[in-house]
Regions:
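Sec-dependent N-terminal signal peptides
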Residues: 4-12
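C-terminal motif of bacterial Sec signal peptides marking the signal peptidase cleavage site
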Residues: 15-16
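C-terminal, non-catalytic "cap/extension" segments appended to globular domains
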Residues: 20-47, 54, 214, 235-237, ...
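N-terminal helix-rich structural modules
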Residues: 20-222, 654-656
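Short His/Asp/Glu-rich catalytic/ion-coordination signatures at enzyme active sites or charged loops
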Residues: 32-47, 96-115, 138-180, 239-279, ...
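Active-site-proximal, well-structured secondary-structure segments within enzyme catalytic domains
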Residues: 151, 155, 187, 194, ...
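Catalytic Zn2+-binding segment of zinc metalloproteases
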Residues: 298, 496-508
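Short pre-active-site segment immediately N-terminal to the catalytic Zn-binding motif
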Residues: 473-492
Length: 703
């Protein structure tokens, strides 16, 4: 069964619909090339709303037909038919996703608020369809005696578990309450997201020319353009997004302004006004606990992790607690180094505060490693990084990316570009890759990857339509877009997700789903190719001279590879541990701000830095359920990443070794969710991963 609860991130097949609404017509473009593509250029909120409602109606009819089939249940007449159902809705979801994440407006947010409860009701009607579950159960029980083909058995097992985990076996009263809770949660998730977006759009810091000391020319030009676009001709705008906040805190010499920008960013959703998220979070936690209580679980984390690699919250916490002491010990060392620098540079004695950390860390980097992040940035051009990713994809996956001319493929914004993906050897078409790189009003913060259509072979081979989305500050006209090393790493990370989509070799749509603490592994692994010699020597060239990065600078980067790992690991772990602890505690009378503070105190969280995501804007966890009690998954996946990286490092051909690359594709990328992740990793590595490689990577001691 398609994962009915995160269907917003999937798309499957095409549908003919005799309706004037272009959102409800078969995906098409000139000559129906590339299997047809979404009509992004024809989107409007009202059209998408109409299509979503119709899609849900048709999909429910599809499921009812399956449930009411009088023939004895079989894999073919039940599970396969479920895999085929909801074609229109699957096609409409990309439009809904774009208007939610990339092109949000007040008009659409109102529609989103109307649709959220309807989507919840839609999911509940399927997951609580007794006749449908009876058919699935009959096939599942039969398979225990007469197992199906491996991929069929996997789909069946996932489908049965999805029903069971979502209340299909409850009595009618409990089913009713379960559905009511889902409905309430859907509204709260929508409100949470809109509140964060409000604060990101409305808390902008405007500077005058006297307040620009320390900032790069490129950043200043971008800030000027943003301010002009917002109607402030003689100002410079620092938007309330990470891509704007991070470089400002790193380079601005104005400590008072750093504090303002820092507080704006880390107070999103926590300003004590109508857009404050604390009461929403408390209610989300209470409802989640009540819902899993109906199923007999003690807490939400126990319910959620049963089908993850970690299996239970105890294992997830054990990993994080094993790394935490080394991380905060490293922070103490980093702060001591920064304090020495601050004492030398400041006329008056200061104590390192969170808005100082990035600024003084950069000073220490220069002193300790003679490494200037701004100097490195001159070699990190977004277009060259894109070429570098294509090169890596060619070497590992045998892919070729061909830029398509503007206007050939409909896009939702002029900044979006599209490439065709082909097999280098055969020329076989694999899919299309969309890139939406820049921040804009109405676009959610962060970086992400998604698919508009996934690969399957159930009813003929489908191509993949995948996208990467970033929030880089758009450069001034004629200027190169230069990014930080961290942002370049994130760019590679998200492209790793896209390659995971393109490499899929599964028959059934459900098998494109993922196990949350495994799906970040492939993307984190691809980050490692950014620092390979081939990428550095061929693609990291100076934006003015075109000269390759000098060896001396490369050596400095590699020598400083574990620099600031205390900060990076601690800010991440604090958020991941907080996520888990929120879902392990009794939320009956919880005060969210107080719980956050007390938990950080118990952890002995260094006061000089914040969590990566403070609770009131922790969208991974509270704008939906995708990462709820799952933020630990990045570290779980990083254990695999560090271990797998050593497999390449030890190979004769290094990170471009053809034999290891083939195993990478065959066992870690192509199967998607068709085999158990732990088994897949053992097929690749010959054993389970261990934590030692992770600790070595971060320069942490390990006993």
């Amino acid at each position: 069964m398609k994962n009915l609860f995160i269907i917003i991130f999937t798309s499957l097949f095409l549908v003919n619909c005799n309706n004037s609404n272009p959102m409800m017509k078969q995906w098409s473009n000139k000559s129906l090339e590339f299997g047809g593509v979404p009509a992004f250029d024809k989107m409007s909120p009202e059209l998408v709303k109409e299509a979503m409602l119709k899609g849900m109606e048709i999909s429910l009819s599809d499921y009812d037909k399956i449930a009411n089939n009088l023939d004895a249940p079989t894999f073919e007449n039940t599970i396969e038919e479920m895999e085929r159902s909801g074609k229109l809705l699957s096609d409409v979801y990309p439009y809904y996703g774009i208007l939610s994440s990339n092109m949000s407006t007040p008009e659409f947010r109102k529609i989103q608020g109307e649709l959220a409860p309807k989507l919840s009701e839609y999911s509940s009607k399927i997951s609580q369809n007794e006749k449908l579950f009876e058919r699935v159960s009959a096939i599942y029980n039969s398979s225990k005696i007469n197992p199906l083909e491996d991929d069929q058995q996997r789909v069946l097992d996932l489908t049965y578990k999805s029903f069971a985990m979502n209340g299909a076996a409850l009595n009618n009263d409990k089913k009713k309450r379960y559905a009511e809770i889902n409905l309430e949660l859907s509204k709260l998730y929508n409100d949470f997201s809109n509140n964060v977006l409000h604060d990101e759009e409305n808390y902008v810091t405007y500077l005058d020319e006297s307040q620009l000391d320390g900032l790069s020319d490129g950043f200043i030009k971008s800030a000027k353009k943003i301010a002009q676009d917002k109607g402030f001709e003689d100002k410079y705008a620092i938007t309330n997004t990470r891509s704007s906040m991070d470089p400002f805190l790193t380079y601005s010499t104005n400590r008072a302004l750093r504090e303002v920008v820092w507080k704006n960013y880390y107070s999103r959703g926590d300003n004590g006004d109508e857009f404050d998220n604390n009461k929403i979070i408390a209610e989300i936690l209470r409802l989640r606990k009540e819902r899993v209580g109906l199923l007999g679980y003690e807490n939400y984390a126990q319910w959620r992790l049963q089908d993850r690699m970690a299996k239970n919250p105890e294992n997830a916490m054990a990993l994080m607690e094993a790394v935490w002491p080394a991380a905060i010990a490293r922070v103490d060392e980093e702060v001591a180094d920064m304090q020495k620098v601050a004492n030398k540079l400041s006329n008056s004695k200061i104590t390192i505060e969170p808005w100082d950390y990035r600024y003084y860390a950069e000073k220490v980097r220069k002193l300790k490693y003679d490494l200037d992040s701004d100097e490195v940035k001159q070699y990190l051009q977004l277009d060259k990084l894109t070429d570098a990713m294509f090169y890596v994809a060619g070497e590992l996956f045998n892919y070729k990316f061909i830029a398509l001319e503007k206007g050939r493929i409909p896009v939702f914004h002029e900044d979006v570009n599209v490439w065709e993906v082909q097999d280098k050897s055969s020329g076989e078409h694999i899919g299309l890759w969309y890139l939406d790189p820049y921040a804009r009003q109405g676009k959610r913060s962060g970086a992400w990857a998604t698919t508009y259509r996934s690969h399957t072979t159930m009813d003929g081979k489908t191509n993949v339509l995948a996208s990467n989305n970033s929030n880089f500050v758009k450069p001034a006209p004629g200027e190169a877009l230069l990014v930080s090393w961290d942002d370049a790493t994130t760019f590679f990370h998200e492209f790793g997700h896209a390659l995971h989509f393109f490499a899929s070799n599964v028959k059934y749509p459900t098998l494109n789903s993922g196990v949350r603490d495994y799906t970040e592994f492939q993307s984190q692994l691809l980050e490692r190719w950014l620092s390979t010699d081939r990428v550095i020597n061929q693609f990291l060239v100076h934006n003015k001279t075109g000269d390759p990065m000098p060896k001396e600078l490369v050596d400095k980067i590699k020598k400083a590879s574990t620099f600031n790992q205390g900060f990076e690991t601690t800010e991440y772990l604090a958020s991941a541990i907080m996520d888990m602890k929120f879902h392990l505690t009794d939320p009956s009378n919880i005060d969210v701000d107080k719980f956050e503070k007390e938990t950080l105190d118990d952890l002995k969280m260094p006061s000089e830095l914040p969590m990566r995501h403070r609770t009131p804007h922790f969208g991974h966890v509270f704008s939906g359920e995708g990462y709820a009690t799952a933020y630990y998954g990045y570290m779980w996946a990083d254990v695999l990443t560090s271990d797998a990286s050593e497999a390449f490092a030890e190979a004769p051909g290094g990170f471009y070794d053809k034999d290891v690359a083939k195993k990478l594709v065959d066992y870690l990328f192509s199967p998607r969710n068709s085999i158990d992740p732990a088994e897949a990793y053992r097929l690749f590595r010959g054993r389970d991963a261990n934590i030692e490689a992770l600790m070595r990577d971060r320069g942490f001691p390990f006993k």
